[in-house]
Amino acid sequence: SLFMLMKEIYPPAYSHFWTDNGAWYLNSQYCKENILKELLEEKADYYFIFYNNEIVGNFRILWDENLKGVCAEKQVKLHRLYLHQKIQGKGIGKKLVFWLEEKARENNYQTIWLDAMNEQEQAFQFYKKLGYKYHSHTFLPFNLMYARVRKMNQIYKLLSK
């Protein structure tokens, strides 16, 4: 199940950001009720990432989700991309981002954007290498998350035709 996958993927990377080791986040975002609600959203897609016939990650795409201040009519948000540690560094994330960029272009989207945790510098550098630029930041409203790690960088890429 998605919940079991996230219980394996999320804690090694993020448990130290939380007073409860991320249990509240996992239970609220990946409980059956929330997943069913998100699956019913009209302009959202959920994907599992497979590697060697094993599920190693997941992500969401939110179509027509706009980042304020970006002058592009059609925008798409890459939301909650998580990869298992054992396959990081194998180029899977890069292939996934390129796949999403191509899918967005095919559907006439001009911009892809996402939130990247300020405390996860390697993630920001990964997207920067792929041409994504800093736009602004926001703060997560999660009370069980330590205040010093709530900053999210909003980054984007304008897509060429």
Stretch-by-stretch model annotation:
Residues 3-86, 97-98, 103, 138-140, ...:
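Acetyl-CoA-dependent GNAT
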Residues 83, 117-118:
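Short amphipathic helical patch at the helix-1/turn junction of helix-turn-helix
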Residues 93, 97, 119-123, 139-147:
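Short glycine/proline-centered loop/turn elements that form peptide/ligand docking sites
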Residues 97, 104-116:
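Conserved GNAT acetyl-CoA-binding A-motif
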Residues 113-116, 128-150:
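Conserved catalytic-core motifs of GNAT/GCN5-like acyltransferases
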Residues 148-161:
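Terminal substrate-recognition subdomain of acyl/acetyltransferases
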